[in-house]
Amino acid sequence: YMAPMVHWPEVMVTHESSEKILFSADGFGKFGALDYEDPEGWACEARRYYFNIVGKYGAPVQALLKKAAGLDIRTICPLHGPVLNENLGYYIGLYDTWSSYKPEDKGVLVAYASIHGNTAKAAQKFAEMLRAKGVEKVSVMDLSRDDMAEVVEDAFRYDRMVLAAASYDGGVFPCMQDFLHHLQSKAFQNRTVGIIENGTWGPTAGRTMKGILETMKNITIVEPMVTICSTMKESDLPAMEALADVIANA
């Protein structure tokens, strides 16, 4: 069976009917090996693998899943990672969610790009506000230091995202721009996003982030957009609380 763009143009998969094995190429692959017990389970590294390698090609993956639905499959053998031979519906269900760009979990990614540490403090404070409002899953990622592949993974995992970034050279601090371009290239869509910008004389981070987000499909950018001048002050907290209310209830 031909499976173009999962994730190479010439990809094909093979179904061995006597043993009911699907040799799935890059489909159902993950980082890791059979003899390694991943404490976070199969999904964590499989999700990171999918969105950073196959993620742009959701439609071809959906087409492959439709072909696979008509086959009797007992074992899946991907090119990368362990052989799958139990609870196949779980793996197939996750691939269906991922390739249709639906959120896997309810939760919030707070991704920040901080130059001197002030935007980082605001992002951490905002995460505390979300937890206080009952949001159980809040992932806080530092775009200057954390693995970009893991930040992209969490962006696709959760249904909401908040971006906090410093203004830089009339735009946004480059690691935030890099992150947004990663999402753009992976067809990020169907999410709710809030924005926190930091600047001194003329903040530009917010409109820059918003402009990139507006090129993506079905992204809801919520208000208010929070503007911090250099460092978070007591007077900034009401706007942050208002945004946290909107995100927590989205």
Give the ranges of each region predicted by the language model.
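Catalytic core of the metallo-beta-lactamase
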Residues: 1-38
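Conserved beta-strand elements of the Class I
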Residues: 15, 22, 107-111, 194
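Cofactor-binding loop segments of dinucleotide-utilizing enzymes, especially the Rossmann-like FAD-
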Residues: 26, 112-115, 143, 197-198
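Glycine-rich beta-alpha junction loops
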Residues: 27-29, 80-83, 115
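FMN-binding flavodoxin-like domain, especially the glycine-rich phosphate-binding loop
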Residues: 34-76, 80-83, 125-143, 151-250
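Short N-terminal or domain-adjacent regulatory/targeting segments
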Residues: 77-104
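Short, charged N-terminal beta->alpha structural module
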Residues: 111-133
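Active-site loop segments of alpha/beta catalytic cores
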Residues: 147
